[in-house]
Amino acid sequence: MSDKIGLFTGSFDPMTNGHLDIIERASRLFDKLYVGIFFNPHKQGFLPLENRKRGLEKALGHLENVEVVASHDELVVDVAKRLGATFLVRGLRNAADLQYEASFDYYNHQLSSDIETIYLHSRPEHLYISSSGVRELLKFGQDIACHVPESILEEIRNEKKD
């Protein structure tokens, strides 16, 4: 029997504890789980890609079957095919997330009917955490330690020093 391989993607700008929870839970469902950082090289992100990747790798270091990869200018289904992933993992906080994700699921299925999308609901304590919310708190000098993994906090602090 072949390995079950999943792919969970996002911009992770920055990664939140909600992302971490979904990844930890998804890692138990698959033999291998790729976490794909998708970024636009023509758009200035909050954290540079290198910092995001390093922070994610540290935050996920305890998960032996998880590997962080980065991609740009590529469709998610093409990355999944390249990595041998037959499952896309998506986290849902609310009905708006489901509606947003459903349109991507439609197109992904049209492009590759072999790839299934699996939705994991956010835990109640993570329902209102978002990367954009964390960025907004940071903009106004607020503490975000309860919203992001320690390794991400370190990357943000290091980036602010520069």
UniProtKB/Swiss-Prot annotation:
Substrate binds at residues 11, 43, 76, 90. GO terms for biological process: coenzyme A biosynthetic process. Its EC number is 2.7.7.3. Pathway: Cofactor biosynthesis; coenzyme A biosynthesis; CoA from (R)-pantothenate: step 4/5. One of its GO terms (cellular component) is cytoplasm. ATP binds at residues 11-12, 19, 91-93, 101, 126-132. Keywords: ATP-binding, Coenzyme A biosynthesis, Cytoplasm, Magnesium, Nucleotide-binding, Nucleotidyltransferase, Transferase. It is found in: Cytoplasm. Its main location: cytoplasm. SUPFAM superfamilies: Nucleotidylyl transferase. Reversibly transfers an adenylyl group from ATP to 4'-phosphopantetheine, yielding dephospho-CoA (dPCoA) and pyrophosphate. Homohexamer. Belongs to the bacterial CoaD family. This is Phosphopantetheine adenylyltransferase. It comes from Streptococcus pneumoniae (strain P1031). The gene is coaD.
